[in-house]
Amino acid sequence: MIQMQSYLDVADNSGAKEVMCIKVLGGSKRRYARIGDIIKVTVKDAIPRGKVKKGEVYDAVVVRTRKGVRRADGSLIRFDGNAAVLLNNKQEPIGTRIFGPVTRELRSEKFMKIVSLAPEVL
């Protein structure tokens, strides 16, 4: 579960290393984001010649959480850390590569690009 002030790793090659959630999108009283939810983030740590700079604000989709996701068959998929993929204004990934596994829950029409770029889909 991601909330405001949560730090997340970045799972793409956009140039950001770490981001902080500043808003969970989708309703005025919405507190938590799960896998597949869109959040507003600010870049806290970035590499020198990346596509994004420290302090910039972007949308991001949550791809991994320590809380995990419960499947219909009762299984639970958990990860060691929280991670997100940065999105541009058209809700497309900024990076051209995705690092680490992503879950099948991202297989909606909006995020098929992320699923196809990911090295492993759980």
From Swiss-Prot:
Instruction: Give a Gene Ontology cellular component term annotated to this protein.
Output: cytosolic large ribosomal subunit
CDD domains assigned: Ribosomal_uL14
Recorded protein name is Large ribosomal subunit protein uL14
Tell me the PANTHER family matching this sequence.
50S/60S RIBOSOMAL PROTEIN L14/L23, LARGE RIBOSOMAL SUBUNIT PROTEIN UL14M
Question: Which NCBIfam families does the entry mention?
Answer: rplN_bact (TIGR01067)
Which family does the similarity line name? Answer: Belongs to the universal ribosomal protein uL14 family.
What keywords appear on the UniProt entry?
Answer: Ribonucleoprotein, Ribosomal protein, RNA-binding, rRNA-binding
Source superkingdom: Bacteria
Q: Which PROSITE patterns does UniProt cross-reference here?
A: RIBOSOMAL_L14
| One of the GO biological process terms | translation
Record keyword Ubl conjugation present: no
The subunit field of the Swiss-Prot or TrEMBL record says: Part of the 50S ribosomal subunit. Forms a cluster with proteins L3 and L19. In the 70S ribosome, L14 and L19 interact and together make contacts with the 16S rRNA in bridges B5 and B8.
> Which stretches are annotated as coiled coil?
none
The function of this protein is: Binds to 23S rRNA. Forms part of two intersubunit bridges in the 70S ribosome.
Question: What's a Gene Ontology MF term here?
Answer: large ribosomal subunit rRNA binding
* Pfam families xrefs: Ribosomal_L14
